[in-house]
UniProtKB/Swiss-Prot annotation:
InterPro entries linked to this entry: Asp/Glu-ADT_sf_sub_c, GatC
Keyword Lipid biosynthesis: no
Gene3D superfamilies according to UniProt: Glu-tRNAGln amidotransferase C subunit, N-terminal domain (1.10.20.60)
Species assigned in the record: Rhizorhabdus wittichii (strain DSM 6014 / CCUG 31198 / JCM 15750 / NBRC 105917 / EY 4224 / RW1) (Sphingomonas wittichii)
The protein's name in its UniProt record: Aspartyl/glutamyl-tRNA(Asn/Gln) amidotransferase subunit C
EC number of this enzyme: 6.3.5.-
Broadest EC class assigned to this enzyme: ligase
C-alpha cells in the first residue's frame, strides 16, 4: 500500500486538519515510510511467541477493594448550601 497526495489531503480533511501543499508533499514520503515499517512487522515470524500485554511484569499495588462509608460526610456536607440531619437539603419540587 502506498500513500499519494490525494490520500493525504483526504485524511487531513476527515481529521479537520489544515495542510498546505508543501506539508502534503512532505507527508507523502513520511507516511509511505511508516507504512513500509508496518509491512515489515507483518513479515515477522511470531509462531511460538506468547502474547504480551507489557514488556516488563506489572504488579498492581492496589489496596483491597472494601466498601466503607468514606468517613468524610461532614467534610462533604460543609460544601453544601444547606444540610439537615446529615443529608443534603434541597427545595421541594413536587406539588
Amino acid at each position: 500500500m502506498s500513500v499519494d497526495a490525494a490520500t493525504v489531503r483526504k485524511i487531513a480533511s476527515l481529521a479537520r486538519i489544515a495542510v498546505t501543499d508543501g506539508d502534503v508533499e512532505a507527508m507523502v514520503p513520511e507516511l509511505n515510510n511508516i507504512l513500509g515499517w508496518i509491512e515489515q512487522l507483518g513479515e515477522v515470524d511470531t509462531d511460538g511467541v506468547a502474547p504480551l500485554a507489557a514488556v516488563i511484569p506489572n504488579h498492581q499495588r492496589l489496596r483491597d477493594d472494601v466498601v466503607t462509608d468514606g468517613n468524610i460526610r461532614d467534610k462533604v456536607l460543609a460544601n453544601a448550601p444547606q444540610a439537615e440531619h446529615g443529608f443534603f437539603a434541597v427545595p421541594k419540587v413536587i406539588e
